[in-house]
Amino acid sequence: MQTKYQKVIKISLIFIIILGFNYGVSFQQFLHYDWADPRGLSDSSSYLAMSNGDYAISSGHRYRVIIPFLTSLVRDLVQPLVPPEQLHWFGGVDAFSFYIVNYLFTSLTGLFLYCFLAQLKFDPKLSLLGVFIFLGSRITILATGAPIVDSLYFLSIIIIVYFCLTQNTTTLAILTPILILSKETIIPFLFLPFFVKQINRKLFGVSLITSFVVFFWVRDTISSWSPNQMENNDPIFNVVVNHLKSGFENIIQTYFSMGGWHGIFSTFSIFWIAAAFGVWLSFKKLNTFYQIPNFLFFIIPITFGFTVLSSNVGRMLLSSFPIVIPYTLIGINYLFSTKSSDHSPLKNIRTLDAHENK
């Protein structure tokens, strides 16, 4: 019993640290977010309308219902408790309500990420560093401080990979019908459990089929609320086709423009280099302690596919955090290892090169 209490206390303390760090990096983004000039976050106006019960918007955003719905509940709780002048300082009740919901979701993402990294055998300090890298990303800060729905999307990703790693089919099966409603881009990640041998694929398959039934039922219901006859149909397939048509243009904009490079760099900044070093270490067998599960590698084509479908490369690339951050930690751990000089990174690299040149 004492061990269980110790684990609860430890996780609680870790979550408090995560809450504090997340507040520190995201609050200024929330406080100074300009609703009149969203600068690339134009979907925020749709979510604001939805949180106020207006789903008659001519946009594919209207089906991402969970965060706007929760925001409306938080608004009803906050409004009578906080004086209007204080709410005005927070940017108004709408902004404050969105921030509470998104702040909680990204903090929970950080907690699940910590547990995920611990399962991969990273020690508590490295695991917490991985959480800080995620929460400190410019894209995560935007997802927390701005009125958008990506926070639940990132939480859904880490929930899926965590329960795949722990081989918890039952929990995955229960949560999948909810996770599928977070954002349409979560759908490819819902197929990751099929690449884990220990997952009960029949049980999860039933859950996934049920999830798609729920997915299309919710979308059909929301479509029926629109007074515009043109908007009564679910545009999901048209949206995918239109994105595919602009795929080549998106590739040029993402990988061959200053704006695209900025979007790539802003996701993990200098930690991209550490991640590449971690990949190299694993490829050269210099890292044999940390083993990255094979199913995580399927995240790479999923994420790359998103950069083809969307010009917002930063928000798409952050989806790769469950595989980028572990490799980043492998690289950082190797560089800052406190082992003896005989096992120092540079010495090992020189030894390997000498061996290859023989």
What is the meaning of each model-derived region?
Residues I158-F163, T170-K183, P188-F195, F212:
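Membrane-interface alpha helices of multi-pass inner-membrane proteins
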Residues G92, F96-L120:
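Transmembrane-helix motifs of polytopic, lipid-linked glycan transferases
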Residues F112-C115, I133, S151-L172, I323-Y327:
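Specific aromatic-rich, kink-prone transmembrane helix
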